Amino acid sequence: MNASEFRRRGKEMVDYMANYMEGIEGRQVYPDVEPGYLRPLIPAAAPQEPDTFEDIINDVEKIIMPGVTHWHSPYFFAYFPTASSYPAMLADMLCGAIGCIGFSWAASPACTELETVMMDWLGKMLELPKAFLNEKAGEGGGVIQGSASEATLVALLAARTKVIHRLQAASPELTQAAIMEKLVAYSSDQAHSSVERAGLIGGVKLKAIPSDGNFAMRASALQEALERDKAAGLIPFFMVATLGTTTCCSFDNLLEVGPICNKEDIWLHVDAAYAGSAFICPEFRHLLNGVEFADSFNFNPHKWLLVNFDCSAMWVKKRTDLTGAFRLDPTYLKHSHQDSGLITDYRHWQIPLGRRFRSLKMWFVFRMYGVKGLQAYIRKHVQLSHEFESLVRQDPRFEICVEVILGLVCFRLKGSNKVNEALLQRINSAKKIHLVPCHLRDKFVLRFAICSRTVESAHVQRAWEHIKELAADVLRAERE
């Protein structure tokens, strides 16, 4: 493919993408395929001679699209949103064209410097404490990670290195292995599974702190666990507080647990993967109060801020905590500016070496929507979730399971878990809308998350009518 054909095919691809997005409402949100459907539809080996672009596009529609779960359908209410916008798509095209691997300033100065500026833009939108920003006189800064899972792991590994160095400085006879077996990290029992995975990868004990009646971590439960573990000779060193849990969008109490972590010299990492986007709205900023106690903070613009995956924003108060844990300087990666104090080499802030020009997406989206446009988008989703909540509350057969704060509604039929499992099975088998469940204590609960950029009140109303019809069928079957 030469440049001339690329221009032509590029226009065709943009048309295909635009048609897909405009017509997505007409596609069944969840596919009809079974596991293994795709292999019989494509050759067993790559072609020896080139295929045509027309053949490939035809196969996309015939082979790929039938197996796609349409996350951007206005009838997709599962998981949490994944962001999608035309400005971000355009930026991704440009990112692919530039094709740099921005592991250092020298590898691509623009890639590095735009990321630094965009992370400061975003930090200011959130009104983060200045300690997290990449200001000349400060020690903090921001970096784009691939996911919140990655950010949690990076924070845990940095905290682990920091505590080992601190203890060995005080007691040089201590080995790393001796320290490691005593380290213990904490999170709420509502924290995302990626926190547990970070503990497994980091080789440290992770303990779940029981949450309160609102599914939030509180000071008393944390303090009790710390005292018990210290008495047993363990070394508390790391804690993850969640703002907007995956199960029910509950919020750990940072104003309570933050001071405890600071007093006990425990690294506090705040995971706001979903909810963080809402903090750009003044009416939701109070949910972030207490972040001043954190050592690191993370949320995903690729969830709810119209920046396509992957783009997970992470800030630290002391960037040397990351670079001290991950810095390696082989000769082939060195450059003349690396010790100048004027530049950032992001390879020292992350687990991989390579990194894409992800800040382009942020730059395009922030400029083409503006802060006001992004705020309006968040507010619309929250309004739609409250609309759905109101519909549920009007039906005496159903109950709301936890306070609706942002764009997630947790609800269920009053009664047994069995009847709710049957309802969810009917909903997802019908494939008109898509939901996923969670467990809140011993209750099986349905999650209704406002996800699509194009979802409107009419889609929420239709979804509720559909749920009510299926609920009537389930209750009728139970009586029979």
Swiss-Prot record:
SUPFAM superfamilies: PLP-dependent transferases (SSF53383). Sequence repeats lie at residues 58-115, 118-178. It is an enzyme of class 4 (lyase). It catalyses: L-dopa + H(+) = dopamine + CO2; 5-hydroxy-L-tryptophan + H(+) = serotonin + CO2. Its cofactor is pyridoxal 5'-phosphate. The keyword DNA-binding does not apply. Keywords: Acetylation, Catecholamine biosynthesis, Decarboxylase, Disease variant, Lyase, Pyridoxal phosphate, Repeat. Its EC number is 4.1.1.28. Disulfide bonds: none annotated. It comes from the Eukaryota. Pyridoxal 5'-phosphate binds at residues 148-149, 246, 300. The keyword rRNA-binding does not apply. One of its GO terms (molecular function) is aromatic-L-amino-acid decarboxylase activity. Pathway: Catecholamine biosynthesis; dopamine biosynthesis; dopamine from L-tyrosine: step 2/2. GO terms for cellular component: cytoplasm; cytosol; extracellular exosome. It is linked to Aromatic L-amino-acid decarboxylase deficiency: An inborn error in neurotransmitter metabolism that leads to combined serotonin and catecholamine deficiency. It causes developmental and psychomotor delay, poor feeding, lethargy, ptosis, intermittent hypothermia, gastrointestinal disturbances. The onset is early in infancy and inheritance is autosomal recessive. This is Aromatic-L-amino-acid decarboxylase. It comes from Homo sapiens. The lineage of its organism: Eukaryota, Metazoa, Chordata, Craniata, Vertebrata.
